[in-house]
Amino acid sequence: GSIPACGESCFKGKCYTPGCSCSKYPLCAKN
C-alpha cells in the first residue's frame, strides 16, 4: 500500500488537486 501522491482526501466524490482522482478512495491519487 503506497501512499497516494496527493495531499487530500476525497470530498463528495471529488478531488480538487489538479491531476488527482478518487481512485484510491477515500484518498486522492495521481491519475
Curated annotation (Swiss-Prot):
PROSITE patterns: CYCLOTIDE (PS51052). InterPro entries: Cyclotide, Cyclotide_sf. The keyword Disulfide bond applies. There is a cross-link at residues 1-31 (Cyclopeptide (Gly-Asn)). It holds the Pfam family Cyclotide. Keywords: Cytolysis, Disulfide bond, Hemolysis, Knottin, Plant defense. Disulfide bonds join 6-20, 10-22, 15-28. Expressed in leaves and petioles but not in petals, roots and runners (at protein level). It comes from the Eukaryota. GO terms for biological process: defense response; killing of cells of another organism. This is a cyclic peptide. Probably participates in a plant defense mechanism. Has hemolytic activity. The presence of a 'disulfide through disulfide knot' structurally defines this protein as a knottin. Belongs to the cyclotide family. Moebius subfamily. This is Cycloviolacin-O14. It comes from Viola odorata (Sweet violet).
